[in-house]
């Protein structure tokens, strides 16, 4: 189910999501959820478009689900950031005026930030050479953006291969590198609200935090300021490198980051086997009071769920309330919901982001 873009119906759609979250969490005696709304338009900081040839020209195109041969041509995209909407016609004019930029271009990706940074990735069905690089450099300068060209097995970077975001959490501004191609939260305004909620929910602690699925350090940076130490895990090499840069950039020095899956971490904590990636890290020295999880849509697998059960507090951000409810059902005999929230990351769709703080009974 997906609703049409209609700002006048936003409140009704949000009410329906709140009702759905209440319904899913009711069996667990959840308190009333805090609700964090979204800007009604221009909230999405990244967008990806295929290009479609019509009347001898390439146009931005999107496709309805299951209709990959029926393009919807667009000139603007009201849910995308104002910066993306300003860049779209200028980029289109550039590829239409330049054979070098337009030839066999099939996809364009925009990444922008609340801090005003922007990056454009242009994907081609042909090799890219110095002639392309010359024109792309002129384009990047004219638009004030970084430009990345991608073709099979090759990537050319004009400027930087990341965008810089700055987010204010409880009066402190954190700076984030967002690498090209890596996951970032698409709705920057709601992401900032999410970070503030998590910061408040964890509280000021004298013990340590274990974070699973830390990504580029989106939550790691502010949460690290609330605890003694953090051990964070992530399996994506790109995200790990971004997180390490972000920790350094923000002078956050109480975090150790390791490339382990949740399953491997469970084995390490249970002393099933040693891991070379944990060399120099004494797991027994940590006094974990809270585990923070932000899993993919499938939620936590049963073994990871059992891993979280051993912690006094579980702070859980979910992009799928159904799998969140299933995980809580597995944990409800030992943990109860102390607070919960809905974050409207994805207006005009049925998708919702939610958060719960579970504490041991």
From Swiss-Prot:
Residue positions annotated to bind S-adenosyl-L-methionine are 185, 213, 218, 234, 294
Domain of life per record: Bacteria
**One of the protein's GO biological processes:** tRNA methylation
Q: List the EC numbers from the record.
A: 2.1.1.-, 2.1.1.35
Q: One Gene Ontology cellular component annotation?
A: cytosol
- Record field: catalytic activity: uridine(54) in tRNA + S-adenosyl-L-methionine = 5-methyluridine(54) in tRNA + S-adenosyl-L-homocysteine + H(+); uridine(341) in tmRNA + S-adenosyl-L-methionine = 5-methyluridine(341) in tmRNA + S-adenosyl-L-homocysteine + H(+)
* Top enzyme class: transferase
**Which molecular-function annotations from GO does this UniProt entry contain?**
rRNA binding; tRNA (uracil(54)-C5)-methyltransferase activity, S-adenosyl methionine-dependent; tRNA binding
User: Catalytic site residues?
Assistant: 319 (nucleophile), 353 (proton acceptor)
Family annotation (CDD domains):
AdoMet_MTases (cd02440)
Please provide the record's keywords in A-Z order.
Methyltransferase, S-adenosyl-L-methionine, Transferase, tRNA processing
**HAMAP family per UniProt:** RNA_methyltr_TrmA
Protein family (similarity comment): Belongs to the class I-like SAM-binding methyltransferase superfamily. RNA M5U methyltransferase family. TrmA subfamily.
Q: What does this protein do?
A: Dual-specificity methyltransferase that catalyzes the formation of 5-methyluridine at position 54 (m5U54) in all tRNAs, and that of position 341 (m5U341) in tmRNA (transfer-mRNA).
What's the protein here called?
Answer: tRNA/tmRNA (uracil-C(5))-methyltransferase
